[in-house]
Amino acid sequence: FLLLAMFAVILAACGGSESEDTAAAKPAAAKPAAEKPAAASLTLEEAAAQRAGGPGSFYIGDLSQLVGPAPAPTLGDEDDMVNLAGLERERYLFDSPYYAALVKKANFTNPTKLVYDGDPIEIQFTCINRTVAPCKLVDAVITENIKERTQGKLTLEITSFPELGLAGPDTLALVRDGTIAFTEITSGYVAGDLPQLEITFLYGLFPDHEVEFKVNAAVQGDLDKLIQDDTAGGQVISRMWISGGDNFFFCRDKIETAADFKGKKVRSHGAALSDWIEAFGANAQFVAFAEVYTALERGILDCGVTVAFAAHGQRWYEVTDYMVGPLSSQLINTMVINAKVLADLPEDIRQILVEEGARHELEAMRVTPAWNEVWTQRNIDAGLEYIEFTPEMKEIQLNKAVPIHVLPNWIKRVGGPDTDIVRLFNEKIAPIVGLKINDDGTTTQVPITK
């Protein structure tokens, strides 16, 4: 008996039996599952191979890897594809240091992991107009990719200037004071507020897309700083590169000679463009993009100037009969976010936004080379007669519009030749275009070295 009693005491002390009070206790929590080991970082070549053949593909030496479907209908060629011919024509984009820097910024080999597990965050992004191709590209690419990468923790809600009752010239101020959180900014619209931004929108100065791209790539960092200073810390998240973004005159009456422009009331979307229009004897007028259709329909305007895809998106072919051009342009608008909105984002979400901004730029470079051809044809198919600029018009542009109107008037708007922006022009742009601005505001031809 003594041995049995001692054995019972030992069992009790060791927990070998339970009282009725402890018998129903919850089982111990299961051990957390071990974290999966982090996947080894991809090489850039492996990442490019995985993404080849469609949306999200990028170039590291083989343009054929970019060939494939566009990210959404109407954003590629006539078959909604990205074809090799268009890529080859704009190859300078992909071989540029700027493109290589975007690939690095996009962080394909070691993308930022999602850590944030709080409430979902929604940011409103404001396009100039949601009916035009660049806004559709934003919606199809950066909006969808951010939603997927953050598992819905960050969503971008697309709206537009017309929906918010905006015209565009005060966009920078609205970002500055937080009225707009995240928006598309086109330099021509805000030239009254920050004319320095028009340094890359000096119509007629850049003879082709490649020269204009070199200019844009050379000064984008400087322009980002201007925007940051003007918007109290606003940041450029992405650029809406459109290598198929030539401007055209959509007119009610036929424009066959330079004299036909005289006296015409022409919608302009920027100060430098207005100077170009005035050089031809026409009367430039700023009209909000969403209001141009009605102004053309009622005869308030004789012509409207915009890119082919934008005119088609707004159905200008219903109120005009002629499409005249092209005025060479590689349209580049910026996507700028309010400083506080960006700062308030969790660090991982913020970095994912930056990476997806770079990837959006890469996708824009992939799909837009076809846009001039495809959207010009769509306007023709809608009933417009296409008239190319005559040699006379090109001569007036070269010898009158640019040297007498566009460049001198821009110099005046930025405060004269003794300004930082003119010095930037001479340092970074003059060697590309072969034209230097002198101390008295005149210009001198210089060797093209870049």
Predicted regions and their residues:
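Low-complexity, polybasic segments enriched for Lys interleaved with small residues
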Residues: 28-29, 33-34
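Acidic/polar, low-complexity intrinsically disordered N-terminal segments immediately downstream
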Residues: 34, 39-41
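A gly/proline- and charged-residue-enriched helix-loop-helix capping module
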Residues: 207-228
